Structures are given as structure tokens and as C-alpha cells.
């Protein structure tokens, strides 16, 4: 079998940097899927992505599609011919679909009789004849939310397409993709190298593009180069570069030929809280800040240029000139904000609407203050500090700094509170109230901050659900899913003794008559318990384990978590499958029992197997009660796992629905007690 390397490059206008990597990997995945569907073998697929191009290279692609045998079974012979032996319409229709006559069909004998069958060999095509459609289909399936048209073309893509190159070895694959004919022309860097050049062979890519076009097409190569050179620059300046993965990938997507440079800003700007300066450098300018070994911001930053002049002075000075006004603004806002205390900004919160039916930010602040105090009492935090932090929680939204640099909310509140002489725990809580901000983010460190963070999240959840605006589909304008998961993480990971139902009731009471949803408490609790499912699935915990616990609807998150861990452990035990099946059987029996079931009467036991099970469940009921009270569900289920033998023996030797009513009721009581033991932890009958 002969093979060749295949190259496809799509040359475009500048692609959206935050979408570039996803587009490239999806393109490669789609090409792979199309090749597999066509039955074409290959060794490996490589993807390339730069601001003005997407490319895929398939290594050792078979140049010929293999032939394949197909079988199409038709009707049974008994149904294919009438009494006179003539083909029926069903047989003729099937044969016509196969491109044959009924007489040309073969017959196959099965244990269900004889059937008509058509066997045919489909000859494989040369790979070059298939590639145009394969590429077109792969591009059509890219995740492009808002495709665009350009010029007078009717085709759509994420950005205008200027060049298409498809090569199988040294052979140009002719065809048209997105309205552009395939050619050997490849565009180089916009400012460096050759603007256009020809490529003769797929093997020349991406090396030729780097040599002639000054473009590093390999995304991961550019990324590694930027990272290494940035770290080296920072080390040379006596610091460490702050290089977040998301920003690194965005910068990688912005340049074709990275040139890593360092620049500086005036030291007097360091009097401004570092978070505001970093927000400007990272968010607006895509710079990497530099910190010293103690974590203090240095007056230097690293940036990545897309051009590489012999003397970079002009580029460095240009970037310093660009960032200076932004830092000057931050400095001005900070100094201006310090002239008014946070607490004095409270009245202005009355001018900002939180939600039309739920009132202003001042109303929300008042509710957070009260709820934070209640939560603080329950978790052993300082109530006065929690209420003070709740009162000040939204005041920094009224500052110039946060108005201009919105992502600094919370952290600027902390700095301003420190300047105002507020307690340190109160100040820190103003920042940590928004934690966790995203999946995997750190949690509030102090209990005071945890109380405020929970109060804020529960106020939003209760309020929005209370006016009937629960999230629908992917729409979640108030980020309720994030709020719910954040609240659960705080309660579970800090093992706080809080109950969801109690918190929602307390939160709802603070809204007065503003809430219209009479089922708000149940709705919020169910919504939050539902978020557990996504959380645990991400951890690799089986869905049936989560469902087993959800069936009991425990509303204390820390308790819910303990049950999930216990059931997940129980599921690994040898006796788990048998006991789960037995519990299903017990559930079915009890569901049909109808009348109320009393207590076990040991003296009424007749069979040895029923007496053994009765004694075992009664003994365990007493033994596990203190463990249930302690929340030690793992030990409880370990002990209940020992019931497998007596349960199996019971079902093997005892007829539950005995004719004697007293005997039947006692046996139902045994099963009811057995089920009750497990239900104190979870409904294990749902385990698969």
C-alpha cells in the first residue's frame, strides 16, 4: 500500500484569537473523522494554527481507498415470490434498490428460513478524488457561532478566506473550498519574509513557511517559545513572570513570529494596588506582569511583538507609551476614590438597580448584612464582622476604579477598607465574597468571608428563583449555576454545618413581599442538589451513586457529600451488587404490601433464615444509630454489607407472602426494617 503525506492549509484574514486553538483542533478532529468514515488509513494527524491560517497535515495517508464487500439482505424467500413463483412487489422493489433483478439475487439459509441477499464489491477510489469533499465537510462542521460572508461570495466562514492549498505528496488536489480554488500559493507573514511563495510538496510544510514566510505555524511551538523567552526575560530582570495559561494561549494566537521583549513603567505607579495595574496590563494590553521573589509587582512587564526589527527600541518605547495613560488613569482613580470612605458610598447604592422586582443594590446589601450575620452564628464566625463586611460588600461598585476596571471589584473594596481602617477580616471578606469566581478557583479563607460569600450567593439564588426566573437551557444571565456550585463548594470543602433549606428560608424572609414564587425554597434546594450531579460527575463518581443519594434528598451539603463518598465506596464491595438487587426486590415487595407495616416480632419467626435476618437487622439497627448521628456513613454501609449472606438465605428459603397474615406481616416488617437501614444513608436499590 502506497502512502503520501497530505497537507491542507486555509489562509484567512486574522482569526479570533480566543477561538483559534479550538478551531484548529476541531478541524483536525473533523478531518480524522472524515478519513475514518471513508476507510482511509493514516499514521498521524498534525494541526497548525496561526493568526491567518488553519492547517492540517496527515502523515502516511493511503493513496487508494480499499474496496469493500457489502451485503444487503432482502425479504424472506417465502415473501419474495407469490403462489405462482413470480417475484412480489416487495422483492422487486428491494432488487431495484440494489440495482439488480430478483433473479440475480443470491439466497442465504438461516435458522428462520431462506432469504434473498445481494452481495457486491464496491471498488475503492483514489484518495485524491475524495479529499476535496473530506476537507469541505470538516470545515463545515467547525464550531463557528457567527459565520460571515465577504465580497460577493455566498459561502460563509468565520473570516474571509484568501488561499486554499491541498497537496497529496507533490500533487495538487484540485477543487474549490469556501469559494477559493486550491493552489500552491501560500501567504507569508504580513510584514516579514516573502508575502507569497509556492509550495511544491506537502513534506515542505511547515518548515518552508518559517524559512520563506517568517511564520511559525505550529501553535504549540510558538507557545513554548513565548513561555521560555518570557521566563528568561523575567529572570534577567530579577523577577518571575506572571503567565496565565489562558493569556499565554491568547498571545500565542495573536502573533505569527513571536518576538518577546521587556519594557518598564514609572515606579510611582506601584503606589496603586497591584491588582489594578495588572488588570490593565493583562486585560487591555496582553502583557505579562513581573513580580519579585516576595510576590511584589515590579515596574517591568513582558510583551510579545509580531515583528522583529534589528533595533527593538521603538517597539519597546511604543508599548511603554501605550500603557502609561492607562496606568495614569488607574492612579488618578485610586487617589480620587481614597477621598471618600466606603461606608459613605452606601447611599449611592440606592441609585443602582439590582433587579427591577428585587430592588436596588442597597436593598441587596441590607439583605446580605442580615443573612451573613445569621450564617456567621451557625458556623462560629464573628457575627459583627460578618455583618459589617456584608454592609460594605457592594460599596466599591460605586468607586471610579471599579467603574472603569470592572474586574477589580472586591479586591479594590479590600484595599479601600484597609485604608479606611476597617478590621482586616472585614477588608479581606470584601475581596473573598466573590470566591470561587470560576471552576477550580480557591475558596474564601476565613469564616467571616465564607459567611459573606454564602449570603451573597443565596440572596441572588433565592431572589431570582423567587421571581420565577430560573435558568433555562444555556441561558443563565445571573450566573445562578456558578453561584450554586460555589456555595456548595464552600459548605462541603469547609465542612460547614449548614442546611440549604434553612438558608433559603432565611434568605426568602428578608425579601418581604417581593417574591412571587410560592415554591421558592423547594425550587432553590432542588436546583442546588442538581448541581451536585455535575460536580461529582466531573470527579468521576458514577451517576447511579449520585442518584442513590439524591433519592433521599439530604439538604445539608456536607452530609450529602459524606453519603456520596460512602455509597461510592460501598459500590466497590463484593456484596454491593447482590444487596442492591435485593433492595430492588424489597422495594417492589413493600410497594405492593399496602397496609401499614409494624415492628419485627422475633417470636413470630418460623424459618431459621427469617429469624437469622431479623436478629441481624435488629442488632445492626442499634449498632449503626450512633454512626448515623456522627455522619460516618462509610462505616455504616461496611457493616450493612455483612447482611448479604442472611439476605440471600432469606430469599432462598422464605416465602414472604405467606398465607398466614401474621406471618406475612412479620416478614414484611423484617424487609421494611432492612430497607430502612440502608435508606438512612441512600437508596442503594438504584445502583446498577
Swiss-Prot record:
Cellular localisation: Cytoplasm
Enzyme Commission (EC) number: 6.1.1.14
Spans traversing the lipid bilayer: none
Annotated keywords: Aminoacyl-tRNA synthetase, ATP-binding, Cytoplasm, Ligase, Nucleotide-binding, Protein biosynthesis
Catalysed reaction equations from the record: tRNA(Gly) + glycine + ATP = glycyl-tRNA(Gly) + AMP + diphosphate
Single biological process term from Gene Ontology: glycyl-tRNA aminoacylation
Chief localisation class: cytoplasm
GO molecular function: arginine-tRNA ligase activity; ATP binding; glycine-tRNA ligase activity
Gene Ontology annotations for the cellular component aspect, listed alphabetically: cytosol
Subunit structure: Tetramer of two alpha and two beta subunits.
Family: Belongs to the class-II aminoacyl-tRNA synthetase family.
Protein name: Glycine--tRNA ligase beta subunit
Species: Haemophilus influenzae (strain ATCC 51907 / DSM 11121 / KW20 / Rd)
Gene: glyS
Amino acid at each position: 500500500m502506497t502512502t503520501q503525506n497530505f497537507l491542507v492549509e486555509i489562509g484567512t484574514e486574522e482569526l479570533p484569537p480566543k477561538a483559534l486553538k479550538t478551531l484548529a483542533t476541531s478541524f483536525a478532529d473533523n478531518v480524522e473523522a472524515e478519513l475514518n468514515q471513508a476507510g482511509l488509513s493514516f499514521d498521524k494527524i498534525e494541526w497548525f494554527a496561526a493568526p491567518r491560517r488553519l492547517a492540517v497535515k496527515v502523515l502516511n495517508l493511503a493513496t487508494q481507498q480499499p474496496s469493500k464487500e457489502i451485503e444487503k439482505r432482502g425479504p424472506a424467500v417465502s415473501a419474495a415470490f407469490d403462489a405462482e413463483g413470480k417475484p412480489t412487489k416487495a422483492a422487486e422493489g428491494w432488487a431495484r434498490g440494489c440495482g439488480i433483478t430478483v433473479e440475480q439475487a443470491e439466497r442465504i439459509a438461516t435458522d428462520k428460513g431462506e432469504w434473498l441477499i445481494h452481495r457486491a464489491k464496491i471498488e475503492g477510489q483514489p484518495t485524491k478524488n475524495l479529499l476535496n469533499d473530506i476537507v469541505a465537510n470538516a470545515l463545515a462542521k467547525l464550531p463557528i457561532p457567527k459565520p460571515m460572508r465577504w465580497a460577493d461570495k455566498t459561502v460563509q466562514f468565520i473570516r474571509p478566506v484568501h488561499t486554499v492549498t491541498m497537496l497529496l505528496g507533490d500533487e495538487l488536489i484540485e477543487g474549490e473550498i469556501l469559494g477559493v480554488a486550491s493552489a500552491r500559493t501560500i501567504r507569508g507573514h504580513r510584514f516579514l519574509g516573502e508575502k507569497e511563495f509556492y509550495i511544491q510538496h506537502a513534506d515542505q510544510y511547515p518548515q518552508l513557511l518559517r524559512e520563506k514566510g517568517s511564520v511559525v505555524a505550529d501553535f504549540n511551538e510558538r507557545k513554548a517559545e513565548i513561555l521560555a523567552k518570557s521566563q528568561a526575560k523575567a529572570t534577567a530582570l530579577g523577577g518571575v513572570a506572571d503567565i496565565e495559561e489562558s493569556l499565554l494561549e491568547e498571545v500565542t494566537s495573536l502573533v505569527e513570529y513571536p518576538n518577546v521583549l521587556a519594557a518598564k513603567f514609572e515606579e510611582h505607579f506601584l503606589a496603586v494596588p497591584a491588582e489594578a495595574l495588572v488588570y490593565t496590563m493583562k486585560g487591555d494590553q496582553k502583557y505579562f506582569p513581573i513580580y519579585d521573589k516576595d510576590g511584589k509587582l515590579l515596574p517591568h512587564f513582558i510583551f510579545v511583538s509580531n515583528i522583529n526589527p534589528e533595533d527593538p527600541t521603538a517597539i519597546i518605547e511604543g508599548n511603554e507609551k501605550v500603557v502609561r495613560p492607562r496606568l495614569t488613569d488607574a492612579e488618578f482613580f485610586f487617589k480620587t476614590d481614597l477621598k471618600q470612605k466606603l461606608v459613605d458610598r452606601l447611599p449611592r447604592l440606592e441609585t443602582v438597580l439590582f433587579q427591577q422586582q428585587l430592588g436596588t443594590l442597597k436593598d441587596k446589601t441590607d439583605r446580605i448584612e442580615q443573612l451573613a450575620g445569621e450564617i456567621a452564628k451557625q458556623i462560629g464566625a464573628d457575627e459583627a464582622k460578618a455583618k459589617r463586611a456584608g454592609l460594605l460588600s457592594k460599596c466599591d461598585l460605586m468607586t471610579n476604579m471599579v467603574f472603569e476596571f470592572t474586574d477589580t471589584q472586591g479586591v479594590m473594596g479590600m484595599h479601600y477598607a484597609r485604608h479606611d481602617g476597617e478590621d482586616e477580616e472585614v477588608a479581606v471578606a470584601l475581596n473573598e465574597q466573590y470566591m470561587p469566581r470560576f471552576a477550580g478557583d480557591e475558596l474564601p479563607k476565613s469564616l467571616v468571608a465564607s459567611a459573606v460569600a454564602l449570603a451573597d450567593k443565596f440572596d441572588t439564588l433565592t431572589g431570582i428563583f423567587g421571581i420565577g426566573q430560573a435558568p433555562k437551557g444555556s441561558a443563565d444571565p445571573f450566573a445562578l449555576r456558578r453561584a450554586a456550585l460555589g456555595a456548595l463548594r464552600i459548605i462541603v470543602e469547609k465542612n460547614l454545618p449548614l442546611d440549604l433549606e434553612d438558608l433559603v428560608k432565611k434568605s426568602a424572609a428578608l425579601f418581604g413581599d417581593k417574591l412571587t414564587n410560592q415554591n421558592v425554597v423547594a425550587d432553590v434546594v432542588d436546583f442546588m442538589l442538581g448541581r451536585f450531579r455535575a460536580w461529582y460527575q466531573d470527579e468521576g463518581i458514577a451517576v447511579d451513586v449520585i442518584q442513590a443519594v439524591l433519592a433521599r434528598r439530604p439538604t445539608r451539603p456536607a452530609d450529602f457529600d459524606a453519603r456520596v463518598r460512602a455509597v461510592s465506596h460501598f459500590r466497590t464491595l463484593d456484596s454491593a451488587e447482590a444487596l442492591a438487587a435485593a433492595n430492588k426486590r424489597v422495594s417492589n415487595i413493600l410497594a405492593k404490601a399496602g397496609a401499614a407495616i409494624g415492628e419485627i416480632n422475633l417470636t413470630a419467626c418460623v424459618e431459621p433464615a427469617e429469624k437469622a435476618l431479623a436478629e441481624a437487622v435488629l442488632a445492626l439497627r442499634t449498632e449503626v444509630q450512633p454512626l448515623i448521628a456522627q455522619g460516618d456513613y462509610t462505616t455504616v454501609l461496611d457493616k450493612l454489607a455483612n447482611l448479604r449472606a442472611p439476605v440471600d438465605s432469606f430469599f432462598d428459603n422464605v416465602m414472604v407472602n405467606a398465607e398466614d397474615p401474621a406471618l406475612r406481616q412479620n416478614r414484611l416488617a423484617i424487609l421494611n426494617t432492612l430497607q430502612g437501614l440502608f435508606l438512612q444513608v441512600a437508596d442503594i436499590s438504584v445502583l446498577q
